[in-house]
Amino acid sequence: FFFLGIIIISLIFLPSFFLPKSIVLIGGKLMGYWSKFCLRIFLSTKIIIKGVENIIKDDKFFIACSHQSMFETFYLQTIFNSPVFILKKELLSIPIFGWYLKKIGSISIKRNKISRDNLSFFNDISNTVMSTDRPLIIFPQGTRVLPNDKPDFKKGVFRIYQELKISCQPVAINSGHVWPKKGLKQSNKNITVSILKQIPSGLSQEEFTKTLQNSIYSELDLLD
């Protein structure tokens, strides 16, 4: 039922692909609200948001978020200003959904391949961030993980932090207990979106990575 709604929203906004990007972005926010509605109605799940006061204002920043389910890819669009996503290039080939991702300015990369496209990847990120007031969002774990998994963050996260020279907004979400990577969805549990204090620019690789990883994993331990 959830994915049927996503398809319907995509079809409704299909004509908007020929309109300004701002119109298409409304469809993304609707998908976020739709996911909240479905979780509440079918799984009796409430969405709790903590740390709204920590959201960086009047300055450029990028979001580094834990990744346990598809929930965050939809719902974070309702909290932040339509974030720019970094995603696998293959996703752009999906009919309608891939067109939507391309239209809203998502940045794609070919995983585990050295190519001319990948060599310009960080330039694309920098140019995109500097030309818009929408924050970039990345998932430093690299892929969806199970709630109790705590892999080291990918090194590319620091490279982005280093290249952009802007603050990082850490976000921890315990969505995997309700909408897991594997298995059935669980009912009567809450999902907490915890917006953590910003990490300022200018830190060393070791200091930044340690601060980011500790802040997100420590918060997830508290949420669990």
Give residue spans per PLM region.
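Short gly/ser/thr-rich secondary-structure transition/capping motifs
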Residues: 42-50, 118-120, 174-176
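Structural element of the ATP-grasp superfamily
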Residues: 38-39, 76, 101, 160-161, ...
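Membrane-interfacial terminal anchoring regions of lipid-handling membrane enzymes
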Residues: 1-21, 26-29, 53-56, 128, ...
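Non-catalytic C-terminal accessory region of glycerolipid acyltransferases
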Residues: 119-224
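Short acidic-hydrophobic, aromatic-tinged amphipathic segments that line or gate anion-handling sites
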Residues: 49, 107-110, 201
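A short, well-structured juxtamembrane/interface segment
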Residues: 37-61
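Catalytic core of membrane glycerolipid acyltransferases/transacylases, capturing the structured
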Residues: 9-21, 25-29, 33, 57-114
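Structured helix-beta-strand junction loops
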Residues: 45, 58, 103-104, 131-132, ...
